[in-house]
């Protein structure tokens, strides 16, 4: 069991005045249960209830009062109700009993002294059906696959992890850190895979873990959807959709399958609710407001880059490749950057963004946009040295921003670039391993100088 940076948020939540029950939102196998058990070591009493177990679900399914429910929970755990002891109650797989979801409001209203965390692996797909969380009585935290920093921590490299977080990796360690980031691209961030690699350092052995996790995702299809046609479409996506990671897709023509656009679209949206993937729709203007154009083709980003590489058989090629731009036209590098950008926030509902211009005689696409204060910052992922940034330049011609970012394999550098009819902007070339901490860079390294 290795530490996760998200445990810092759990500590902040526990110390907060007016604390509400916390609902962990995240895909299957991102480490929700393990994180809570790690956090539980900081409490006097820990009660864990997995509602997939019938006897635990029955505690909530009866029509007893909340006081009787609470008494039953403590009785079953064989621990006394002692208000002098810090007690953490963990309700896992809460989606298995809707009444358990409703009980969260009473924990907030009647027993705010108790620390309550709920989680469920299929929570997202079921949210749109029969489960409704009590409004204003719970708060949420998103949990994603391990970030590069957490990967380093799992390998026992805490000092290097701190340097990556602080944007302070010494120049002498640049190549070494880049090599570790490539390992992270291959292994990915699913905790069970990371733990296996940290223990054995074996790329072959982690394949067995990937295969087991993938089988679990596929076996859950019947839980994701009830209609046979939608189940078939979901199975097809889980079998073949990984090869389109980082690509813009069209439902009507997805991998030349026989599924109708509506069926493919519904299947993708169902998988999106489970947080196994995200359909990222483009921004078409270079300024606020942020309004993704749902009429345009979305970009497909999967939960984990390591899983993508395993399914499509790219691990060996990536291992011996010096430039990620050579693989999939750079899609793998772009995909792992997207994963790092999402992992940088624990706020649920964060959406990644990219920009396109689809004019008849002028097409362009910037890999990502991030919001920093009142600014919309473009990011291009171009790991090679001799690469053009035509799309980024087109974005900056339409934008009033003074800063653009390029993530690459090289060292930290910057260029001042002229633009027609306006003042120049600064292009910062940033090592790709800093992808999850760009807000730190923008705040600490640029500050008022760039945005003044």
Predicted feature residues:
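Short regulatory helix/loop adjacent to the ATP-binding pocket of P-loop NTPases
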Residues: 124-140, 153-156
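Interdomain hinge/linker elements that couple catalytic modules in large macromolecular machines
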Residues: 153-336, 343-346, 353-361
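Short glycine-rich substrate-engagement loop in P-loop NTPases that contacts/grips substrate
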Residues: 53-85
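N-terminal pre-Walker A segment at the start of P-loop NTPase domains
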Residues: 1-15
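Conserved lysine of the Walker
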Residues: 32
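A cross-kingdom feature that marks ATP-driven nucleic-acid transaction machinery
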Residues: 14-22, 29, 38-45, 272-452
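Conserved catalytic segments around the Walker B and adjacent sensor/switch elements
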Residues: 42-56
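Structural recognition of the conserved hydrophobic beta-strand(s) that form the central parallel beta-sheet
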Residues: 90, 115-121, 142
